[in-house]
A protein has these predicted regions:
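Ferredoxin-type iron-sulfur electron-transfer modules in oxidoreductases and energy-metabolism complexes
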Residues: 347-363, 373, 377-438
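Gly-rich Lys/Arg/Thr-decorated short loops/hinges at beta-loop-alpha junctions or inter-strand turns
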Residues: 106, 135, 158-172, 293
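N-terminal, Lys/Arg-enriched amphipathic/low-complexity engagement segments
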Residues: 1-47
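Conserved hydrophobic positions within beta-strands
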Residues: 77-79
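Hydrophobic alpha-helical positions that pack around
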Residues: 196-308, 314-319, 329
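Flanking helices and flexible, charged tails adjoining ferredoxin-like Fe-S electron-transfer domains
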Residues: 101-132, 137, 168-169, 247, ...
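Short, well-structured beta-strand-loop connectors
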Residues: 49-62, 81
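Histidine-anchored nucleotide/phosphate-binding helix
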Residues: 177-192
Length: 438
């Protein structure tokens, strides 16, 4: 098996800026902001009020239903207010603001050292749900929901997505290098509740140290294998990852579980280990702060709720005026206009790019070269879909498989006419999904 997929691109990686640097531990100094919607599903409900004193690890907002997630304080301090605050999505979200007392007093956690074969499904799911763990690769889907398919016996593969195919991002790589034991234990905990499943850790072959480290530690483990995949973007996209590692194809109407797979990010399985083994809630994560406009690009172990500007200052600030600020990776991240934004559970990176790294070019007419079709991993025709989107022809857009687009950005990247193909298609997809909810 070749562990790859049709299409894709090879953009500048930029990982050399941070991949071999030690992770920096950062304790925040300013107010902490906790948006009540850091996940897919219903926003969490605050259970604290203005003036309450809280400790790090304390529950401050509880899940509002099954498809939702708990939120915990990551520092000790006093609840200042609950009000809408700007997030990296560009929208204002109701948020709990805590005045950081800089004491970092933490609740006592209850560890669980039961052997894997004695862990019950109920206690694993309960620990994950109480810890507020969500997918940390970007989507933010509540993990306890993902681990609750209709039939456990139908799940054949638990895949840890360690591809980290976005340029500049190296936090997952550092997590494997520095904390591989917890990553492996987190996967083994998940496998313990899926009796028929095999484990796969999928890593791109531009990370030979991580591959060798995992292979050495998993030597003799018949239930987990490490797949070294050819480096190509978007190898880490869920549908492409599943196809590359299992040969199974899923479309936009399916969930990975429909193909017998569950996919987790590296940081997610690490958090599962900490929740089950240490009783620790999700209050921190690794984030990459990088780009050619950052003075000291690095990975930071930060408290969730920390202000973006504090994290940039931790990386010694800007080395030059940034022309573009991005929350997440340069291909699928969100452009932001301010650094007064809180880091959330799904914050993987903050990028600051100078004019030299950002191409500002006016789009022109399609020249019908077909490059966008060649690189599209979703097997659709981006040029045609973008034209239908521009015409607002939603019926034809759906009929021509517009909903199969994963918004990876490959088409926009290669387009010689510099058409904003991904953005045009994404806008229409959003409209279709909104109409379905009515």
């Amino acid at each position: 098996m070749k562990f790859t997929f049709k299409g894709g691109i090879h953009p500048y990686e930029g990982k050399e800026l941070t991949e071999e640097k030690d992770v920096i531990d950062y304790l925040p100094q300013g107010d902490m902001v906790y948006p009540l919607s850091q996940h897919i599903g219903a926003p969490a409900k605050p259970i604290v009020k203005k003036g309450d004193r809280v400790l790090a690890g304390q529950l401050i907002a509880e899940a509002a239903g099954f498809v939702s997630a708990n939120i915990h304080a990551s520092v000790s301090g006093t609840v200042k207010t609950i009000e809408p605050r700007l997030t990296s999505s560009g929208s204002k979200v109701n948020s709990i603001i805590i005045e950081n007392d800089k004491q970092y007093e933490t609740l006592a956690y209850t560890p669980n050292d039961k052997p894997l074969d004695e862990l019950t499904r109920e206690e694993v799911i309960d620990a994950i749900q109480k810890a507020g763990i969500v997918g940390m690769g970007g989507a933010g889907f509540p993990t306890h929901v993902k681990l609750s398919p209709k039939n456990l016996d139908d799940i054949d593969f638990i895949i840890v997505n360690a591809s980290e195919c976005e340029p500049y991002l190296t936090s997952d790589y550092r997590r494997i290098i520095d904390d591989s034991d917890k990553v492996i234990e987190g996967l083994r905990i998940v496998l313990a509740i899926f009796p028929n499943a095999q484990g796969i850790i999928a890593v791109e072959d531009n990370k030979p140290k991580a591959i060798k480290l995992l292979q050495d530690k998993l030597a003799g483990d018949a239930r987990i294998r490490v797949n070294a995949m050819p480096t190509k973007y978007p190898e880490g996209a869920e549908r492409q990852l599943i196809f590359a590692n299992t040969g199974r194809y899923i479309n936009s109407s399916m969930l990975p579980a429909d193909a017998g797979c569950i996919v987790h990010n590296v940081d997610t399985v690490y958090a599962i280990c900490e929740a089950v083994r240490e009783g620790k809630p999700l209050t921190e994560r690794l984030v990459t702060v990088s780009g050619d406009a950052i003075k000291n690009p690095c990975n930071i172990r930060m408290k969730i709720g920390t202000n973006y500007q504090e994290l940039i200052d931790c990386a010694e600030g800007f080395s030059k005026d940034p022309a573009k600020l991005v929350a997440g990776g340069p291909m699928m991240g969100k452009a932001i206009y301010t650094t007064d934004i809180p880091a959330t559970k799904s914050s993987s990176a903050i990028l600051a790019l100078s004019e030299d790294a950002v191409a500002e070019m006016e789009p022109s007419a399609c020249i019908r070269c077909g490059r966008c079709i060649e690189v599209c991993p979703g097997r659709v025709m981006p040029n045609k879909l973008a034209t239908l989107a521009a015409r607002n022809d939603i019926d034809a857009f759906v009929k021509n498989n517009g909903m199969e687009c994963c918004e990876c950005g490959c088409c926009s990247y290669v387009c010689p006419a510099r058409r904003h193909l991904t953005q045009m298609i994404a806008g229409t997809r959003k409209l279709v999904l909104a109409n379905k909810k009515k």
